[in-house]
Curated annotation (Swiss-Prot):
Name recorded for this polypeptide: Succinyl-diaminopimelate desuccinylase
Reaction(s) catalysed by this chain's protein: N-succinyl-(2S,6S)-2,6-diaminopimelate + H2O = (2S,6S)-2,6-diaminopimelate + succinate
Positions with a binding annotation for Zn(2+) 2: D107, E142, H356
Signal peptide positions on this chain: none
Entry's transmembrane regions: none
GO molecular function: acetylornithine deacetylase activity; cobalt ion binding; succinyl-diaminopimelate desuccinylase activity; zinc ion binding
Required cofactor names: Zn(2+); Co(2+)
Binding site for Zn(2+) 1: H73, D107, E170
Enzyme active site: D75, E141
Length: 383
């Protein structure tokens, strides 16, 4: 392991954060450490504890001019079996291959450290920078995400806080740091469908209504439906059934109902209302006695080429020499909440190959590269 004294400022901070076991929604004083550093750098701090979730908003600069916000989360997913790890998941070790190992190394304490060190350096080098540098940090991203970024954004919107650009530190890279940035995400619409039948004896089907038999053609049609064609930025909308439950456990009983859980990952070519109406039409066409509970996790958002994406892409090219690819693939992130403010949102972070896995790790030197990319982006937008 590399001695602590030999580590760069970014790696020192990343290790300090990883050593705090902040399994969602626990923050474990990660934000206290970050706020102390930002306060020392002249940032105005605003802690926002909402229910059992720690959040904070911090800003540095003028009230006039554009605002560049760094957003991220201090919470991490559970470790899984600790004995399966090569080292304690909260030890923050750098191995002989130069990999920083620990829960949160990639998702996303490495990014948090890079953001903070880049911002410290920027406000020192450019104390009279235009606009504002801001941070929006939560401990509720890996969990329900009700009282984290979503709730903070609602407060910021209520007081008409300006947010022009936002870099979310999610691990966007696939093979090399900066090779991919996310300039949007698909929407996520979940549903729990109940199809009601009539329970009975399997030997007397004329006295029962089998919800499995009734629902099967409708579910097959939903699975085969072509929802949209996507567009230049998004693939076509997808429909997936994740759970299907029916039956009493007995082999001689026709069940009384069937429950199917499904999810849409939808592009900007579809709307929530449109998808719901089309599902209802298919279920009605098959004459089902049905009920659906809908749950919208987030609407799709897209940041088209413009000031933020241009600055991030140019900084990646300047620091690494490579051209980045803008993508909307993958799951949802807190960017979906920030985008509701009309903010240009880009996700940029380290390689995501081991996120949420046992032995999560990231190339330690990548975090210093990421710091420089963030710093150069700050210069391009606010210097």
């Amino acid at each position: 392991m590399t001695a602590h004294a030999e580590l760069s400022p970014t790696l020192q901070l990343a290790c300090d954060l990883i050593r705090r076991p902040s399994v969602t929604p626990i923050d474990a004083d990660c934000q206290k450490l970050m706020m102390q550093r930002l306060g020392d750098a002249g940032f105005k701090l605003e802690p926002m504890r909402i229910e059992d979730v720690d959040n904070f908003w911090a800003s540095h600069g003028q009230h006039e001019g554009p605002v560049l916000c760094f957003a991220g989360h201090t919470d991490v997913v559970p470790t899984g079996p600790v004995q399966a790890w090569q080292n304690d998941p909260f030890d923050a070790l750098i191995d002989e291959h130069g990999m920083l190992c620990g829960r949160g190394a990639a998702d996303m304490k490495g990014s948090l450290a890079a953001m903070l060190v880049a911002a410290e350096r920027f406000v020192t080098d450019y104390p009279d920078h235009k606009g504002s540098v801001a941070f929006l940090i939560t401990s509720d991203e890996e969990g329900p995400a009700h009282h984290g970024t979503k709730a903070v954004v609602e407060r910021l919107a209520a007081r008409k806080e300006r947010l022009d650009w936002c870099i979310v530190g999610e691990p966007s890279s696939t093979s090399l740091v900066g090779d991919v940035v996310k300039n949007g995400r698909r929407g996520s619409l979940g549903a729990k469908l109940t199809v009601r039948g009539v329970q009975g004896h399997v030997a007397y089907p004329h006295l029962a209504k089998n919800p499995i038999h009734l629902a099967a053609p409708a579910l097959a049609e939903l699975a085969a439906e072509h929802w949209d064609d996507g567009n230049a930025f998004f693939p076509p909308t997808s429909f997936q059934i994740s759970n299907l439950n029916s039956g009493t456990g007995a082999t001689n009983v026709i069940p009384g109902d069937l429950v199917a859980v499904f999810n849409f990952r939808f592009s900007t070519e579809s709307t929530v209302e449109g998808l719901q109406q089309r599902v209802a039409a298919i279920l009605d066409k098959h004459g089902l006695d049905w009920h659906v509970e809908w749950a919208l996790s987030g609407l799709p958002f897209l940041t088209e080429p413009g000031a933020l994406l241009d600055a991030v892409s140019a900084s990646i090219k300047q620091v690494t020499g490579r051209d980045t690819k803008a993508s909307t693939s993958g799951g949802t992130s807190d960017g979906r909440f920030i985008a509701t403010l009309g903010t240009q949102v880009v996700e940029l972070g380290p390689v995501n190959a081991t996120i949420h896995q046992v032995n999560e790790r990231v190339l330690a030197s990548d975090l210093d590269v990421l710091t420089e990319i963030y710093y150069q982006t700050l210069i391009k937008l606010l210097a």
